[in-house]
């Protein structure tokens, strides 16, 4: 993240993986989960107590490598803003693939600041 050291957080990692799995296994691409819930709900459900939370998602075979997805996020103003936002101090990220789904590869980054 663009403002200095950001550390990994297990709760954010769990929320990220859960959302990537949900999108891949239920064949959709959205910040809203198949249960209608938001990133904040997913982070809380994963045991993360937050004061600020945000999310980047990406999907598609053209984004199958870490370098490709990071390049896409940096090239997108909204996604890049999340990457550079100074109020986020922790991160969790995941990638999940399901060849039977429309996009095949699904990425989720969850950013947070603990309360």
Segments from the language model and where they lie:
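A well-ordered secondary-structure block
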Residues: 38-115
């Amino acid at each position: 993240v663009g403002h200095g050291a950001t550390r990994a957080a297990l709760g954010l990692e769990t929320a990220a993986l859960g959302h990537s799995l949900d999108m891949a296994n239920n064949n959709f691409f959205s910040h809203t989960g198949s249960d209608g819930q938001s990133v904040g709900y997913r982070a809380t459900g994963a045991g993360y107590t937050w004061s600020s939370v945000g999310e980047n998602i990406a999907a598609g075979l053209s984004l199958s490598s870490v370098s490709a997805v990071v390049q896409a996020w940096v090239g997108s103003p909204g996604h890049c803003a999340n990457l550079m936002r100074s109020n986020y101090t922790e991160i969790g990220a995941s990638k999940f693939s399901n060849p039977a789904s429309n996009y095949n590869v699904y990425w989720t980054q969850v950013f947070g600041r603990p309360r």
